[in-house]
Amino acid sequence: VKTVENDPLFDKKQAQRILRYYVEVQKVAVKEKAGVIVEHFHSEVHNKIKGQARAMVVASNIKRAVEYYMAISRLLEERKSPYKAIVAFTGEIKYEGVTYNEAKLNGFPSSQIEKKFRKDPYRLLIVANKFQTGYDEPLLQTMYVDKGLSDIKAVQTLSRLNRCYPVSYTHL
């Protein structure tokens, strides 16, 4: 806490960055955000595009994508939702003592992610540096971004929502 107004040893911006980082790395932050995502998806999104709308969650890294996948999957199950999530990332990650990859978490090979996401019950795609460029899914209607995006990455990522589908309204 800054006690002297002109303290040269205190950098307000650096302190804010550190505090934000501390809050963001807490598991409770992911759980709370996952709750907002699931609630918003069910109340505002799932009935769009004639009841076929999909959503993408853009995570900052693989660990965060796995945390989102687990939290969102648990919340969907708890509310007895007819929908499921898919996670997409490259490689493997050791998380809480277990090594995971896409196939282990999703229950099907990575090569089937795009095909599976086009059909129910899969409605939420959680990604870490994957499917953010060159991915064309007209049913993708909403994007939840939990990652800093700038310049061309922002344009490329958000352009995933700019695909033509009759009666499509996009949320960001």
Report each predicted region and the residues it spans.
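Conserved motor-coupling elements within RecA-like helicase/translocase cores
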Residues: E96-Y122
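Conserved SF2 helicase motif VI
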Residues: I152-Y165
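A short beta-strand element within the Helicase C-terminal
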Residues: D136-K147
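Interdomain helical connector at the RecA1-RecA2 junction of SF1/SF2 helicase-like NTPases
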Residues: V1-Q52, Y69
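Conserved helicase motor "Helicase C" RecA-like lobe of SF1/SF2 P-loop NTPases
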Residues: K63-I86
